[in-house]
From Swiss-Prot:
Protein name: UDP-N-acetylglucosamine--N-acetylmuramyl-(pentapeptide) pyrophosphoryl-undecaprenol N-acetylglucosamine transferase
Compartment(s) of residence: Cell membrane
Membrane-crossing residue ranges in chain numbering: none
Listed InterPro entries: GlcNAc_MurG, Glyco_trans_28_C, GlycoTrans_28_N
Gene: murG
Length: 355
């Protein structure tokens, strides 16, 4: 039987693309195992799917001064030894890594055991963990065309990011019914992430009376960010977080306002939803969201507002522009080479396995 080890963790963004591959890998006859950290978020997400999970020690490799810099390298070395032992016992045909520091010892151990490893980079520029893994990888999957410039030409493949199948099964009527909306008024969906986006929430609420003249508004504002004083507005609903019904809300939405995390924007691309991206500022991140957003804007998929210039005026201008030009955004997304990532990556896994 064909066997594959998936790895990646530390954040949900390093796990959900792996989850998106699982159904396709099973269809191809793969026995799937997952290697992650002992207590990371990946353990909970993977075990509930019934996939065999194997924990290893994990340490973060920091580029700044921290007392843990003295202990974490030993955790990485321990994780490497544990990964080598696991790979010897599991004897997979291929390792697929979504990144995160737990993946580093797994990819290095795969190289040592002569098992081909494929790694995936979601952001425009490779993060530290993936940079450490690239020399040991057989292939490197990229999410953005620009990322190919940072990768060895003989290893780089533009695939996009795997998207969960259930997102494609949304029903517009179910989404409208869930929100108590009518079918004859367009819908604006705001996705602030699980923790919310304070500046985005403020801008939307400041502009709400104007937005409601043209749209019905679904506002996913993040944990603890619901403001009951806005419930009086007809055509406006707010939620901390939406789980199983998210696919229906996407189906109901005509346009979307979102942060610019790689997984989030690739979902918008796959669903062909015209969108406005408001990336995290460089001060609040390593700048990857800004680069992600600029790439999507350059390719004609998105309208971008830098957080520093976000205001009532810039947001209203963006919303009206994107809504009035929906067709051009959708057409650009249809022509993208970053779609069908699941099929492309599984094809690459098969190619590497057969070499």
């Amino acid at each position: 039987m064909k066997r594959i080890v998936l790895t990646g963790g530390g954040t949900a963004g390093h796990v959900t693309p792996n989850i998106a591959l699982i159904a396709g890998l099973k269809e191809q006859g793969y026995e799937i195992h997952y290697i992650g950290s002992y207590e990371g978020i990946e353990r909970e997400l993977i075990e509930k799917l019934g996939i065999p999970y194997h924990g290893i020690s994990s340490g973060k490799l920091r580029r700044y001064l921290d007392i843990k810099n003295f202990s974490d390298p030993f955790k990485v070395l321990k994780g490497y030894r544990e990964a080598k032992k696991l790979l010897k016992n599991l004897d997979p045909n291929v390792v697929f890594s979504k990144g995160g520091f737990v993946a580093v010892p797994v990819v290095l151990a795969a190289k040592k055991r002569k098992i081909p490893a494929i790694i995936h980079e979601s952001d425009m520029t490779p993060g530290l963990a993936n940079r450490l893994c690239i020399p040991s990888a057989a292939k490197v999957c990229a999410n953005f065309p620009e990322t190919l410039n940072y990768l060895p030409k003989e290893k780089a493949v533009l695939t996009g990011t795997p998207i969960r199948k259930e997102l494609f099964s949304g029903n517009k009527i179910k989404g409208l019914d869930f929100c108590g909306f009518t079918a004859n008024i367009p819908v604006l969906l705001i996705v602030g992430g699980s923790t919310g986006a304070l500046k985005v929430n403020e801008a939307v609420r400041n502009l709400l009376p104007t937005l409601l003249k043209r749209f019905q508004v679904i506002h996913l504002c993040g944990k603890g960010k619901v403001d009951p004083s806005f419930n009086k507005h007809k055509g406006y609903v707010q939620y901390e977080y939406i789980g199983a019904e998210l696919n229906h809300l996407f189906a109901a939405a005509d346009i979307v306002i979102s942060r610019a995390g790689a997984n989030a924007i690739c979902e918008l691309l796959a669903l062909r939803k015209p969108n406005i991206l408001i990336p995290l500022s460089a001060a609040a991140s390593r700048g990857d969201q800004i680069l992600n957003a600029e790439s999507f804007e350059h390719q004609g998929y998105s309208y971008v507002i830098k957080e520093e210039v976000l205001s009532n005026e810039t947001l209203l201008q963006a919303v009206n522009h994107v809504f009035d030009n929906q067709k051009s955004y959708i057409e650009a997304m249809k022509n993208s080479n970053q779609n069908d990532a699941v099929d492309k990556i599984i094809g690459l896994i098969e190619e590497v396995r057969l070499k």
